[in-house]
Structure formats: C-alpha cells, structure tokens
Amino acid sequence: MVSHSELRKLFYSADAVCFDVDSTVIREEGIDELAKICGVEDAVSEMTRRAMGGAVPFKAALTERLALIQPSREQVQRLIAEQPPHLTPGIRELVSRLQERNVQVFLISGGFRSIVEHVASKLNIPATNVFANRLKFYFNGEYAGFDETQPTAESGGKGKVIKLLKEKFHFKKIIMIGDGATDMEACPPADAFIGFGGNVIRQQVKDNAKWYITDFVELLGELEE
C-alpha cells in the first residue's frame, strides 16, 4: 500500500505524466459539446454519464453515442473554431512547469484526436504525445465511424497506452491524472494515479483514489518544494 508521502515523492520524481483530457485538462466533455452542435445533447450526455460510471463497456458506449451524433467533418471543425474547449485553471502552468523539469507530458483521451490536438497545441504538447480516438469521414465529409484499432477505443485502453509508453521510452515512473474510472484503471501499469475533481466529482474515483485533488495549484505546489 503506497502512502500519501510516497505518492508525493513519485509525482516529484516522475519522468512522464499522463493527463486525461475531458473534465480534466479541459472543463468540458468533448463528446457532449459535439452532441450540442449536432442537436442531440440530452440523449448523449445521459449516455456519457452512464459510460463514465463504468456501467457500459467503453467501445459500446462510444459506438452508441457516435451513431446518434453522426458528426460531419464540418461540424467538428465548427466546434473547434466557434466553441473551443476551455482549459481548466492551473493546467497551463502545471504542464509548463513539468516541461521545464524535462518531464514528458502526454494526453490520453477517449475523446477525439482533432479536438485533443487543438488542446495539446495550446499547452505546447507535441501531437506525437497525443493518444485519442480518430473519427472517420467519407470523402464528402459525412461521418463514417471511428478507428476501432486505437487502444483508446477500448475499455482499459489508457493502461495499454501507458504500457506502450513504458516499453518505447523506458520511463521509470509514470503518473496518470484524471477524473474518471478509466483513468484510475490505468494504474497499474501507471506507477501512481492522482484523481482530479476540479470540474466534476466522480464519487467512485473520489472514494478510491489514494490522492485526490480539486485544484491543479496543489500539484504546482508539490513541484516548488
């Protein structure tokens, strides 16, 4: 059983930190915002709530929601241009401080790559450090499904990405930070998990995370010591 002080040491000495995106790095759930633009917000946010609670296998929940939304390429571009996601207060400073310390920062999301890459660019995170789901479109821009081969399309996908990062870059200590059950499940293989409740509190995560924060300032403070 890792103590809180050991967790703090792990975070302080980590060589890689992975963040979830929706409701963690950004304030919104990207899929719900996309549903809003496509006019099916209510039905989809109810499905998201069920999926986040871990009641439905991730890929099934994603397939079901996307079948309802049917987002076109143009609608995705419109979302990014007209209603870009809002960064969670403190995240820009935290990522920048980690990068100054030569810590590799990754975004691992069950959301969509086009939206997550936009978020990454605001945080100076290279697109190569982004793992997310890819939407597919027909030549006329209509929705054609999503790439089911991405690890993030599966339940347990975030853990698969972290395992892959360890194998590829030989990281000694990887920290996963996120708001949801799928983030908590990624530890192990992550060496530590920090639950984040600054945008939404998921009771299951709050109850089970050994370290739970509601403000990124707390983590910034850990790096100053």
Curated annotation (Swiss-Prot):
EC numbers on record: 3.1.3.3
Database matches in PANTHER family: PHOSPHOSERINE PHOSPHATASE
Effect of residue 23 to T: Reduces L-phosphoserine phosphatase activity by about 80%
Disease listed for this protein: Phosphoserine phosphatase deficiency: An autosomal recessive disorder that results in pre- and postnatal growth retardation, moderate psychomotor retardation and facial features suggestive of Williams syndrome.
One BP annotation, GO: in utero embryonic development
Subcellular location: Cytoplasm, Cytosol
Activation/inhibition comment: Inhibited by calcium ions.
Residue positions binding L-serine: 20-22, 109-111, 158
Residues given in the record as phosphate binding sites: 53, 182
Active-site residues, as the UniProt record annotates them: 20, 22
Effect of residue 23 to A: Reduces L-phosphoserine phosphatase activity by about 50%
Cofactor section: Mg(2+)
The species this protein was found in: Homo sapiens
Name of this protein: Phosphoserine phosphatase
Entry keywords, A to Z: Acetylation, Amino-acid biosynthesis, Cytoplasm, Disease variant, Hydrolase, Magnesium, Metal-binding, Serine biosynthesis
Annotated InterPro entries: HAD-like_SerB, HAD-like_sf, HAD_sf, PSP
Residue intervals passing through the bilayer: none
